From Swiss-Prot:
Top-rank taxon, per record: Eukaryota
Protein name: Tyrosine-protein phosphatase non-receptor type 12
Quaternary structure (record): Interacts with PSTPIP1 and TGFB1I1. Interacts with PTK2B/PYK2. Interacts with LPXN. Interacts with SORBS2; this interaction greatly enhances WASF1 dephosphorylation and might mediate partial translocation to focal adhesion sites.
Boundaries of every Tyrosine-protein phosphatase domain copy: 28-293
PANTHER family reported in the protein's UniProt record: TYROSINE PHOSPHATSE N18, PUTATIVE-RELATED, TYROSINE-PROTEIN PHOSPHATASE NON-RECEPTOR TYPE 12
Residue numbers carrying Phosphothreonine: T519, T569, T598
Reaction catalysis annotation: O-phospho-L-tyrosyl-[protein] + H2O = L-tyrosyl-[protein] + phosphate
Binding site for substrate: D199, C231, S232, A233, G234, C235, G236, R237, Q278
Species of the source: Mus musculus (Mouse)
Any Pfam family hit: Y_phosphatase
Post-translational modification: Phosphorylated by STK24/MST3 and this results in inhibition of its activity.
Residues bearing PTM Phosphoserine: S19, S331, S434, S448, S467, S550, S567, S596, S603, S606, S608, S613, S673, S748
Bias (Polar residues): 558-573
Biased composition (Basic and acidic residues): 692-711, 766-775
């Protein structure tokens, strides 16, 4: 392919890269993220080591501790001076068109490295020095002044003497003629000082940059000696100037390769100098500057009568876009963003971000007509950095659609369980879905979605187990009838029931992915009658994973589920209670509720406690109606009894018409007045303070039975609690073992707290002026 065609294709490619993609980003940002990803890989995997710059004697010679010269391309100083005999300077060689040492990319000299800087200039016979920063920027010193001002006396950095013979002011830059003297020998060199390039940014116009580079090459056309280019760190602005000059030399020689690509050029430069072209704006500037050079070169070809070369070779922008799409199909899909439990300052974000690899995106589904409940496409109205708009993709019938719950549960999993059958089956669509939220900063989220987090996402409950000495070692199996949960009011309980069902579904999907079971297909849009809260089920050592149920989503035996024998191990008790809770949740019907699309990256505690999400439970004070509680006496090692509470449904206390427990109904107590307090017995105080004696294993049961009978409750036979909808059937032949007795007692929301039993019963609770019949 001839040079004219190559130049035209590049210009059209740059124009196509300016158009935003479906995420609102242009291709410059996508490519630059890939460059940062590669640089992070170089640093973390030590592909290009920087051992010399990390030495203790050289650390003070680095302006920035994270910008160190690569060992394989660093500039070594052999010229010795009385005060400096080290061979280290923070500088690297960058190869040019004709030689491997066309440029010296270095940092702005420090006060203690000015002599090293002049040693390098003298040793390598440098004639051109390009300075792309000011001495001070944003109130900080970016470079030590290593030259004298024009008209002032020469300055000496022993054994070097520098004087300024001339200074010429140009648009945005200066040209100074410096005279360098060393050991009765003098050399004349030229400094091109660009003064209008902001740090980590780009100038408003790059015409003066091209003018400076063009004039620089008039002073030195060859590459026999290197050109020294520096800014403050010697990587961002320095790399941009090197890339433009390198391409310009290729253009002058007519050697622009057919596969010329700025991405590959800068990637190659980054293997020679750390972080060459440091920002996305600088990366775009290089593209635009090179495209302008190519346009001027095309005009020269046309002026010289080369129009016949261009006949019939026009390539439209649409054709260029199609070629870019074909290139996207050859590259791997992007990986989902990973979260980290502890953020690290500095360049840690480079390590966390995944490369936004190009990949074809299926067509976006149009939003459905407005309904009574918000759908996924209407949760966020604005698509910006902190409120990314989720996008649903169309899947072919033969593919398994991506499961929204499973995809985001995988991203929020702190244990990093990503290798499963689900990932291999739905890899393509899941990764597309994750790619669209990659710009969300970690641990940041919209404050408008804070509210009551218990109503938005499910949480695993960490249960403090009782001491092994308290658990009855002769405990026997007990039967629990797990009937369907009875819901009196759909509008009050639909949110909680759907949250429970989806929490079990997320836990079940995690277990099925480990066993490599077949994944049932999931539709792109959930039907309205099946929508519920998306929950994130986190499994840790305290949270037992339920056994996978049958595919229809119900327990194999809904009416007779036998509990396992309570073991003396503390964690086993918690696992069994969590197992019982999950079975009750599983039997609850799915009700109509709004779909809450929660971003796992916005989770306040997704990775803060090593797999436990109980932090949000304690932070958000809400009324929790529990349907299962276990009370056991404390051992001598604990100061208070441990009370296990497993929340089954979440309801606000102020909601009118909340069903009361069976105890309240039997006592014929109205909604306005709380139930009468039971009479206090000495044993209730002894339980919280005194050690356990062996003969008390049966005594507390008898006392507790008497107290419950006074409230209208029975401890044997069949009980029916309307508040939780749980039928408890106590075994008749089982001895009254108090420590492992699972009394299904449902308290009103106002009475449930997270403190121990002894602390709750230490002082009677109630109104400040109780009724007379209470005393």
């Amino acid at each position: 392919m001839e040079q004219v065609e190559i130049l035209r294709r590049f210009i059209q490619r740059v124009q196509a890269m300016k158009s935003p993609d479906h995420n609102g980003e242009d291709n410059f940002a996508r490519d630059f993220m890939r460059l940062r990803r590669l640089s992070t890989k170089y640093r973390t995997e030590k592909i290009y080591p920087t051992a010399t710059g990390e030495k203790e004697e050289n650390v003070k010679k680095n302006r920035y501790k994270d910008i160190l010269p690569f060992d394989h391309s660093r500039v070594k100083l052999t010229l010795k001076t009385p005060s400096q005999d080290s061979d280290y300077i923070n500088a690297n060689f960058i190869k040019g068109v004709y030689g491997p040492k066309a440029y010296v990319a270095t940092q702005g000299p420090l006060a203690n490295t000015v002599i090293d800087f002049w040693r390098m200039i003298w040793e390598y016979n440098v004639v051109i020095i390009v300075m792309a920063c000011r001495e001070f920027e944003m109130g900080r010193k970016k470079c030590e002044r290593y030259w004298p001002l024009y008209g002032e006396d020469p300055i000496t950095f022993a054994p070097f003497k520098i004087s300024c013979e001339n200074e010429q002011a140009r648009t945005d830059y200066f040209i100074r003629t410096l005279l360098l003297e060393f050991q009765n020998e003098s050399r004349r060199l030229y400094q091109f000082h660009y003064v209008n390039w902001p740090d980590h940014d780009v100038p408003s116009s790059f015409d003066s940059i091209l003018d400076m580079i063009s004039l620089m090459r008039k002073y030195q056309e060859h590459e026999d000696v290197p050109i020294c280019i520096h800014c403050s760190a010697g990587c961002g602005r320095t790399g941009a100037i090197c890339a433009i000059d390198y391409t310009w030399n290729l253009l002058k020689a007519g050697k622009i390769p057919e596969e010329f690509n700025v991405f590959n050029l800068i990637q190659e430069m980054r293997t020679q100098r750390h972080s060459a072209v440091q920002t996305k704006e600088q990366y775009e500037l290089v593209h635009r500057a090179i495209a302008q050079l190519f346009e001027k070169q095309l005009q020269l070809y046309e002026i010289h009568g080369a129009q016949k070369i261009a006949d019939g070779n026009e390539i439209t922008t649409g054709t260029m876009v199609s070629s870019i799409d074909s290139e996207k199909q050859d590259s791997p899909p992007p990986k989902p963003p990973r979260t980290r439990s502890c953020l690290v300052e500095g360049d840690a974000k480079e390590e966390i971000l995944q490369p936004p690899e190009p990949h074809p995106v299926p067509p976006i589904l149009t939003p459905s007509p407005p309904s009574a409940f918000p759908t996924v496409t209407t949760v966020w109205q604005d698509s910006d950095r902190y409120h990314p708009k989720p996008v649903l993709h169309m899947a072919s019938p033969e593919q398994h659609p991506a499961d929204l719950n499973r995809s985001y549960d995988k991203s929020a999993d702190p244990m990093g369980k990503s290798e499963s059958a689900i990932e291999h089956i739905d890899k393509k669509l899941e990764r597309n879905l994750s790619f669209e939220i990659k710009k969300v900063p970690l641990q940041e989220g919209p404050k408008s979605f804070d509210g009551n987090t218990l109503l938005n996402r499910g949480h695993a409950i960490k249960i403090k187990s009782a001491s092994s000495s308290v658990v009855d070692r002769t405990s026997k199996p007990q039967e629990l009838s797990a009937g369907a949960l009875k819901v009196d009011d759909v509008s009050q309980n639909s949110c909680a029931d759907c949250s429970a069902a989806h929490s079990h579904r997320a836990a079940e999907s995690s277990e099925e992915s480990q066993s490599n079971s077949h994944t049932p297909p999931r539709p792109d849009c959930l039907p309205l009658d099946k929508k519920g809260h998306v929950t994130w089920s986190l499994h840790g050592p305290e949270n037992a994973t339920p056994v996978p149920d049958s595919p229809d989503g119900k327990s194999p035996d809904n009416h007779s589920q036998t509990l396992k024998t309570v073991s003396s191990t503390p964690n086993s008790t918690a696992e069994e209670e969590a197992h019982d809770l999950t079975e009750h949740h599983n039997s609850s019907p799915l009700l109509k509720a709004p779909l809450s699309f929660t971003n796992p990256l916005h989770s306040d505690d997704s990775d803060s406690d090593g797999g436990s999400s109980d932090g949000a439970v304690t932070r958000n004070k809400t009324s929790i109606s529990t349907a299962s509680a276990t009370v056991s006496p404390a051992s001598s090692a604990e100061s208070a009894c441990t009370r296990r509470v497993l929340p089954m449904s979440i309801a606000r206390q102020e909601v009118a018409g909340t069903p009361h427990s069976g105890a309240e109904k039997d006592a014929d107590v109205s909604e306005e007045s709380p139930p009468p307090l039971p009479e206090r017995t000495p044993e209730s105080f002894v339980l919280a303070d005194m050690p356990v004696r062996p003969e008390w294993h049966e005594l507390p049961n008898q006392e507790w039975s008497e107290q419950r009978e006074s409230e209208g409750l029975t401890t044997s036979g069949n009980e029916k609690h309307d508040a939780g909808g749980i039928h408890t059937e106590a075994s008749a032949d089982s001895p009254p073992a108090f420590s492992d007795k699972k009394d299904q007692i449902t308290k009103s929301p106002a009475e449930v707290t997270d403190i121990g039993f002894g602390n709750r019963c230490g002082k009677p609770k109630g109104p400040r002026e109780p009724p007379s019949e209470w005393t």
